[in-house]
C-alpha cells in the first residue's frame, strides 16, 4: 500500500474549502466558506488531519496528486472514484481527474465490483485475526480488574483461562494496541459527552471510539455509556462528504465537484445536457441540518479518522442528486426521490428502490440503531445487514482492537438486489472477457507473424476483416507474440552457448589445462563431413589435399609398446577397448589415458615415408582441454545430445593457417596431424583462434566409458598403430548395429559389443589398392589442422617436421580443400578386394557446401 495517492483534485479547493488546523488535541476543524485555492499543507491538514506532523510524510505522484506513504486512500476519494465509474468514466479518465494512480483506481473499482465495498483491505489482512471481540472483552476485563497488569501477564492469563490457544493467542504488541485503543475509548467517553447528535428531534445515543492509529469505530449505545444530545447535529459522510472533511461546510464543495465533473465531460466531449451549473445549495446536505441553514459547524472535538466514518448517519443519506441528473449516467438507473426526515431536503436515490444505503460506517452501528427502535429512519433491514456482512466478508470482531483498522465495512454500500444487479451490469460493461482464438484465427495470425513481426495498421485491419477479430485484439496478439518470440530467442541463444566448463582430468604431470568455449565465434576451424550413408559403406580418397604421400592414422593406446612402421603394408586391426587401466609397459602411468589425442579428422601427412609412433618412456606435457560439447547444425536436423564429460586434448596446429588452436575431440582414437606448408611449431604455440568450426552433435552411445583406446586386433600387448599407403588411405569402420551414428569428422568408432568379433569392432585398414570395409556405417576421414606438434604428439621422438612439401596449388583455403575433398569423395570409385561396393551419400557435397559457404549458425 505504499505510495498510494490521496485525494488530489487538480488545484481545486479542498473538501468544502477547509483551511484545516491539525493540533495535538485533535480539536474540531473550523469550517470555512472561502473559495480560495488551498495550499498543499492545508490540503494535507484537511485530508490527513488525524495524522501528526511527524506522521504526515507526503509525496507527489506522477499525475501531480499528493499522497501519504503507507496510508490508504481516503474514503472521500474512493467514493468519488466509484461515482465517476458509475457515471461512465473510464479508469484512465478517473485517474487523471482525481490525480490518483491508475493501479489504485483499478484496485478500488475491482474490489467494489466484487464485494460492493469501497473500504481498503486490512493491512496484513491475509493473516488470521486474533484480537476477536471475545479476546478484546477479556483484555478489557483484565485491565479493569488490575489496572497495572502487563501485556505479557494478560497473554499468560488468556492462555490459562483457555480463551486463546497457542495458535491464535495475540502477541504482546497486539495486546498493547488493544489497551491503547481501550484507553482512547475511555478518554473519548469522558471528553465527548456532548458531541453526539440526533436528527429530526430523535435523540440518538452513540459513542465514538477513537484509536491512536486513526481507527474510529462506532459502538452501539446499548453496550456502553449513553451520550445523548437533542440539539447537536450528527455529521455523516455522504459520498462526497466523508469524515475527512470533519464538520466542514459544503458551501464550497459544489464548485469543486462541478469542476471535477466538468473535467469528465470535457474528456468525453459531452457537455452538461441536464441542469445548468449546480449551486452550492444543491450539494449533499448534512443530515440533521436545521431548515434555515446549510453550512454547519461541528462542535465535536474528536473527529479523528481518515479512513472510517467518524459518526453514523442516522437517516441513510443516498447519493447526491446532482451527480445523476445529467446525461452522464445510464438511464437504467432510475431516480426515485425519497424523504427522510421533516427537516431534511429530499434526495434522490442512487438506484431503484428506497432501500439503498451507501453509509460507510461499520454495520454494528446500524444493528444497534435498529435494535433501539430507529428502524423507521433506516431503510436497511437487519437480515440484509447480515447477508451483506457475509457477502463482504466483514468481521465485526475487531471492535476497538485496532486489528481491523482498514477492514472492509460490511454495511458499506448496503443495497438491494437491484443495486447488486446494477453493479454486476457495470462490471460486465467495464470489464472485457478474455479473448479466445479459434485454430483458424491462430493459423492466420501465425502466418502474418511469419511475414512480419510488426504489421502496420492496414495489415491489421485486413487481417481483422479476414478472421473476424477487432483490430485492437490483433494488435495485442502481435505484442504478446513478439514477447513470446523474444523469450524463445533468448532460450535458443542460451542453447547455442553451452557450459564451457567440463571435467578436466587431474593430472600429476606438468600438463597445461586449456579451456575452450564451444561457441561459433571462438572455436578452431574444423572442417567436417558426413560421407557415409546408413545403407552401405563409402570409401573416399583425398586426392587434392596432399601430394603423393601417405595418409597416416596414428592410433595411440594407453601404453605404447613399440613404434609400428606401417609402410605399404596392411596394418593390424586395432580393437577398441573401453577401459583406461594403467598398463605399465614402459613405466608409463595411467596418465597416458588422458594423453590420447582423439580423432579430430584424419591428419593428412605430406611425408613421403611413414610416421613412427614411439613410446620410449618420455614424459612430455600435453595440453589437456576440458570437456566441451561439439555441435553440428545440420540443415534439417537439430541434434542436441552432447558429450559433456569426455576429456579432450589440445592439438597444436601450424602457424601457416593464422593461429594454433585447441580443437575439441573425443578420446576414441588418435589421428595424425595435418602437414602444413611450413614447419610445425612446438607445443607452446597454443593461441586462441577465431576460425569457425562445423558444429557436430553426437548421440551418446549406449555405453559411455571414460575413454576408448585402440589396441592391436589380437588383443595382445598394447601398441600404437599407423595406417599408411603410398597413394591414399582408405579407412572404414563398422557400427555393427551399435545404434548411433558415426561422424566422419571425428572418426568415432562405436563402443564394442560384448560378442562382437575383431572385424566387427575394429578399424579396417587397407593398402593403396583395396578398401576392406565392414558394411554398415563408414567413417570418412577429412583434413583438419591437428594442433599436436611433432615433438609432443603421442610422444613422437623424431624432431623433424612431418613435411615441407606444400599442399597442392588448387587448395588455397579450407573451403577449397573441403570442396576438392568432397568432389573427390563423390567421384572416386575404389577397387574393393572384398567385393563391397562403395556407396556415397548424395547430400554430402551439399552439406559440405552449406558448412563452408553459408552463414554459420
UniProtKB/Swiss-Prot annotation:
GO terms for biological process: adult walking behavior; brain development; brain morphogenesis; central complex development; compound eye development; compound eye morphogenesis; eye-antennal disc morphogenesis; glial cell migration. Residues 241-257, 308-317, 404-416, 500-519 have a biased composition (Low complexity). Coiled coil: none annotated. Residues 134-182 are annotated as: RED subdomain. Expression is confined to the eye imaginal disks, parts of the brain, the ventral ganglion and the salivary glands. The keyword Lyase does not apply. It comes from the Eukaryota. Residues 236-257, 271-322, 392-417, 488-519, 554-588 are annotated as: Disordered. One of its GO terms (cellular component) is nucleus. Changing residue 641 to T: In strain: 253.27 and closs19. Residues 56-182, 430-489 bind DNA. Keywords: Developmental protein, DNA-binding, Homeobox, Nucleus, Paired box, Transcription, Transcription regulation. It is found in: Nucleus. Residues 289-301 have a biased composition (Polar residues). The keyword Transcription regulation applies. Residues 59-115 are annotated as: PAI subdomain. Involved in eye morphogenesis. Belongs to the paired homeobox family. This is Paired box protein Pax-6. It comes from Drosophila melanogaster.
Amino acid at each position: 500500500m505504499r505510495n498510494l495517492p490521496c485525494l488530489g483534485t487538480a488545484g481545486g479547493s479542498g473538501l468544502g474549502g477547509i483551511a484545516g488546523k491539525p493540533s495535538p488535541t485533535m480539536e474540531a476543524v473550523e469550517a470555512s466558506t472561502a473559495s480560495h485555492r488551498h495550499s498543499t499543507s492545508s490540503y494535507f491538514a484537511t485530508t490527513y488531519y488525524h495524522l501528526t506532523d511527524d506522521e504526515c510524510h507526503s509525496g507527489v505522484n506522477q499525475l501531480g496528486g499528493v499522497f501519504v506513504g503507507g496510508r490508504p486512500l481516503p474514503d472521500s476519494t474512493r467514493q468519488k472514484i466509484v461515482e465517476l465509474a458509475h457515471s461512465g468514466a473510464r479508469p484512465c479518465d478517473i485517474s487523471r481527474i482525481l490525480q490518483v494512480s491508475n493501479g489504485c483506481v483499478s484496485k478500488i473499482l475491482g474490489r467494489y465490483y466484487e464485494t460492493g465495498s469501497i473500504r481498503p483491505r486490512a493491512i496484513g489482512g491475509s493473516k488470521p485475526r486474533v484480537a476477536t471481540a471475545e479476546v478484546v472483552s477479556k483484555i478489557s476485563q483484565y485491565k479493569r480488574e488490575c489496572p497495572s497488569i502487563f501485556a505479557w501477564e494478560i497473554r499468560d492469563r488468556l492462555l490459562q483461562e483457555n480463551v486463546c490457544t497457542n495458535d491464535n493467542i495475540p502477541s504482546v504488541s497486539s495486546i498493547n494496541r488493544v489497551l491503547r485503543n481501550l484507553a482512547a475509548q475511555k478518554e473519548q467517553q469522558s471528553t465527548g459527552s456532548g458531541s453526539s447528535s440526533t436528527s429530526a428531534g430523535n435523540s440518538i445515543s452513540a459513542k465514538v471510539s477513537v484509536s491512536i492509529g486513526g481507527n474510529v469505530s462506532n459502538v452501539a449505545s446499548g453496550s456502553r455509556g449513553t451520550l445523548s444530545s437533542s440539539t447537536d447535529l450528527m455529521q455523516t459522510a455522504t459520498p462526497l462528504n466523508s469524515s475527512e472533511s470533519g464538520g466542514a461546510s459544503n458551501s464550497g464543495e459544489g464548485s469543486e465537484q462541478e469542476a471535477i465533473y466538468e473535467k469528465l465531460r470535457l474528456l468525453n466531449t459531452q457537455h452538461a445536457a441536464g441542469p445548468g451549473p449546480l449551486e452550492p445549495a444543491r450539494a449533499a446536505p448534512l443530515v440533521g441540518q436545521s431548515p434555515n441553514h446549510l453550512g454547519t459547524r461541528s462542535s465535536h472535538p474528536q473527529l479523528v479518522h481518515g479512513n472510517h466514518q467518524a459518526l453514523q448517519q442516522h437517516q441513510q443519506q443516498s447519493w447526491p442528486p446532482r451527480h445523476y441528473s445529467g446525461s452522464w449516467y445510464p438511464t437504467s438507473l432510475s431516480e426515485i426521490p425519497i424523504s427522510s426526515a421533516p427537516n431534511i431536503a429530499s434526495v434522490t436515490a442512487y438506484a431503484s428502490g428506497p432501500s439503498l444505503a451507501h453509509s460507510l460506517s461499520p454495520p454494528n452501528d446500524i444493528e444497534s440503531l435498529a435494535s433501539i427502535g430507529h428502524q423507521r429512519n433506516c431503510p436497511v433491514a437487519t437480515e440484509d445487514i447480515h447477508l451483506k456482512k457475509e457477502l463482504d466478508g466483514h468481521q465485526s470482531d475487531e471492535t476497538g482492537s485496532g486489528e481491523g483498522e482498514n477492514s472492509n465495512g460490511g454495511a458499506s454500500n448496503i443495497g438491494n438486489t437491484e443495486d447488486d444487479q446494477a453493479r454486476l451490469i457495470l462490471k460486465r460493461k467495464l470489464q472485457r472477457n478474455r479473448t479466445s482464438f479459434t485454430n483458424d484465427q491462430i493459423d492466420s495470425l501465425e502466418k502474418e507473424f511469419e511475414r512480419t513481426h510488426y504489421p502496420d495498421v492496414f495489415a491489421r485491419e485486413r487481417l481483422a476483416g479476414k478472421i473476424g477479430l477487432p483490430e485492437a485484439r490483433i494488435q495485442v496478439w502481435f505484442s504478446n507474440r513478439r514477447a513470446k518470440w523474444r523469450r524463445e530467442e533468448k532460450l535458443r541463444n542460451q542453447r547455442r552457448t553451452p557450459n564451457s566448463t567440463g571435467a578436466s582430468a587431474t593430472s600429476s604431470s606438468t600438463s597445461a589445462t586449456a579451456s575452450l568455449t564451444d561457441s561459433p565465434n571462438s572455436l578452431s576451424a574444423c572442417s567436417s563431413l558426413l560421407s557415409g550413408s546408413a545403407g552401405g559403406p563409402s570409401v573416399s580418397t583425398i586426392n587434392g589435399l596432399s601430394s603423393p604421400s601417405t595418409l597416416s592414422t596414428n592410433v595411440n593406446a594407453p601404453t605404447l609398446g613399440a613404434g609400428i612402421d606401417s609402410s605399404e603394408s596392411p596394418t593390424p586391426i586395432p580393437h577398441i577397448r573401453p577401459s583406461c587401466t594403467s598398463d605399465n609397459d614402459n613405466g608409463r602411468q595411467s596418465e597416458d589415458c588422458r594423453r590420447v589425442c582423439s580423432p579430430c579428422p584424419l591428419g593428412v601427412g605430406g611425408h613421403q615415408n611413414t610416421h613412427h609412433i614411439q613410446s620410449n618412456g618420455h614424459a612430455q606435457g600435453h595440453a589437456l582441454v576440458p570437456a566441451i560439447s561439439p555441435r553440428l547444425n545440420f540443415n534439417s536436423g537439430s541434434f542436441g545430445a552432447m558429450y559433456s564429460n569426455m576429456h579432450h586434448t589440445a592439438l597444436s596446429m601450424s602457424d601457416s593457417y593464422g593461429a594454433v588452436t585447441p580443437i575439441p575431440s573425443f578420446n576414441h582414437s588418435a589421428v595424425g596431424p595435418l602437414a602444413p606448408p611450413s614447419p610445425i611449431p612446438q607445443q607452446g604455440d597454443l593461441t586462441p583462434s577465431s576460425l569457425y568450426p562445423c558444429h557436430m552433435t553426437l548421440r551418446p552411445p549406449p555405453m559411455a566409458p571414460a575413454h576408448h583406446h585402440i589396441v592391436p586386433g589380437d588383443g595382445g600387448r598394447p601398441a600404437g598403430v599407423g595406417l599408411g599407403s603410398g597413394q591414399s588411405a582408405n579407412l572404414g569402420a563398422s557400427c555393427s548395429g551399435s545404434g548411433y551414428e558415426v561422424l566422419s569428422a571425428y572418426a568415432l568408432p562405436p563402443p564394442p559389443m560384448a560378442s562382437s568379433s575383431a572385424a566387427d569392432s575394429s578399424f579396417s585398414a587397407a593398402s593403396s589398392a583395396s578398401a576392406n570395409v565392414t558394411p554398415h556405417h563408414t567413417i570418412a576421414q577429412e583434413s583438419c589442422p591437428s594442433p599436436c606438434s611433432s615433438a609432443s604428439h603421442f610422444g613422437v621422438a623424431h624432431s623433424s617436421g612431418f613435411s615441407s612439401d606444400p599442399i597442392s596449388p588448387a587448395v588455397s583455403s579450407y573451403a577449397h580443400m573441403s570442396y576438392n575433398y568432397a568432389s573427390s569423395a563423390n567421384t572416386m570409385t575404389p577397387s574393393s578386394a572384398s567385393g563391397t561396393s562403395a556407396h556415397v551419400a548424395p547430400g554430402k557435397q551439399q552439406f559440405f557446401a552449406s558448412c563452408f559457404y553459408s552463414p554459420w549458425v
